[in-house]
Each structure stands twice: as structure tokens, then as C-alpha cells.
């Protein structure tokens, strides 16, 4: 709600200070979805020894790993994200709470497909469910706190760039093609290098048919078509 209040056409959104550890770091994605031009986690330059609840000193990954996850995922394509965001092509979603009551859901029941949020693009909707998933359903063991996040950028007609963690995404056609059969033309996992997307592997049907699962921080380039 705070991001909504401060993100206006006459007021570019800038987050001057925010928590840099724990599940709240997922709201970096929410800020990007509101067109933020800056985001500054507090205490990243603090070199003092910090101790955990058991009294032992925390290592760097325990102190900064949550913020590092965001930057490691998006830094290689920061310029591309900024350009796409300026053009109004970027949308994001973050997990607001861990839902322990909904059950695993069924990928075979597309009428009641497990969905927490839906993002709307030209000709396509992206249904998003947060948490840990296997190929077919949400698994029993979930993170203690909500940490799911997804960024989807529209690259062209039926072509999208996705970056996310602990979520599942299923596209479906809308408008006049709502009832048409559709398919993934290609789903590539990779990263940006010097402004170009370089695929490290192409996902097969078993890895895409029931939704795109982001079990680890992952970047995908997706091409869709309708018959």
C-alpha cells in the first residue's frame, strides 16, 4: 500500500531505506513493479560482527544473502529491466502470506488451478502460485515466511522474460483467442551477458506442461503461440 501511495506519474518512486534481510527483501520486486528508480537496503556496509540467536557470529550469507539473491538474479540484466520498465512492459508479484490451508492443488483441474495472483498482458494472462512446487503440485514443506517473487517483462507479441523464486507460472491466452489451444514454442533458461540473452538450456515438455516452476532463482525467456 505504501508503494502505491508514493508511486504516481508526478513522483518517481524511490525507496531510500528498507530492511535488507529476511522475507521482506522480496518487496524489491514489488518496487520494480511500481517503476522504482532506486532501492536502498539499510546496513549493507555494516562490517560489525552480528550474532544469531544461538550467540555465534553470522557469516556474510546469513546477513546479506536475502538481498544478494535479488541482485544476483537481476544485476546481469539491470539495463534491460530498466528499459522495459520505462516502456511499461514490466509487471511483478510477491507472496503476501504462506497459505497453509489451500492444499497442494491439482494441475489437471484447470478450472480450479491453484492461483494466488494473476498478471494481465496483451493477449495473455499469467497465473501465479507462490511457494515450493514439484512438477505437479505445491509440496508440503514450505518456507517459514513468505518469500515468493516473480518479474515478468513483455518482450514482444507472445514473448516474455521471467525472473523469479519460489513460485509457479502458467500462461493462458485471453481475448479473442481465449478458447484456442496454445503451447510453448520455446522456453529457455539462461542469463544476460553484455545485453544479450544467452541460453544455458532449453526446457522440455515435462518441465513446462504443468507450469513454469521457479524452485531456485531462475531467469527464463518464453515464446508462446496459439493454434
Residues covered by each model-derived region:
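C-terminal beta-sandwich/jelly-roll accessory domains of carbohydrate-active enzymes
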Residues: 119-227
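Aromatic- and carboxylate-lined catalytic core of secreted/periplasmic carbohydrate-active enzymes
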Residues: 29-167
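Aromatic-residue detector
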Residues: 6, 27, 31, 50, ...
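Flexible loop/turn segments at secondary-structure boundaries
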Residues: 2, 21-24, 47-50, 169-170
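Glycoside hydrolase catalytic-domain groove-lining segments
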Residues: 1-28
Amino acid at each position: 500500500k505504501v508503494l502505491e501511495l508514493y508511486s504516481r506519474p508526478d513522483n518517481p518512486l524511490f525507496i531510500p531505506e528498507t530492511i535488507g534481510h529476511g522475507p521482506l527483501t522480496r518487496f524489491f520486486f514489488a518496487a520494480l513493479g511500481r517503476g522504482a528508480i532506486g532501492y536502498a537496503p539499510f546496513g549493507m556496509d555494516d562490517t560489525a560482527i552480528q550474532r544469531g540467536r544461538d550467540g555465534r557470529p553470522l557469516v556474510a550469507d546469513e546477513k546479506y544473502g536475502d538481498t544478494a539473491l535479488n541482485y544476483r538474479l537481476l544485476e546481469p540484466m539491470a539495463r534491460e529491466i530498466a528499459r522495459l520498465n520505462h516502456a511499461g512492459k514490466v509487471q511483478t508479484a510477491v507472496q503476501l502470506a504462506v497459505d497453509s490451508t489451500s492444499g497442494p492443488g491439482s494441475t489437471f483441474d484447470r478450472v480450479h488451478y491453484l492461483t494466488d495472483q494473476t498478471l494481465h498482458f496483451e493477449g495473455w494472462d499469467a497465473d501465479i502460485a507462490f511457494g515450493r512446487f514439484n512438477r505437479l503440485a505445491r509440496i508440503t514443506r514450505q518456507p517459514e515466511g513468505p518469500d515468493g517473487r516473480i518479474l515478468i517483462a513483455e518482450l514482444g507479441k507472445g514473448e516474455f522474460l521471467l525472473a523469479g523464486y519460489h513460485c509457479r507460472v502458467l500462461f493462458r491466452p485471453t481475448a479473442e483467442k481465449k478458447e484456442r489451444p496454445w503451447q510453448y514454442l520455446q522456453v529457455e533458461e539462461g542469463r544476460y551477458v553484455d545485453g544479450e540473452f544467452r541460453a544455458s538450456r532449453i526446457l522440455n515438455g515435462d518441465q513446462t506442461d504443468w507450469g513454469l516452476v521457479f524452485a531456485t532463482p531462475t531467469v527464463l525467456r518464453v515464446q508462446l503461440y496459439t493454434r
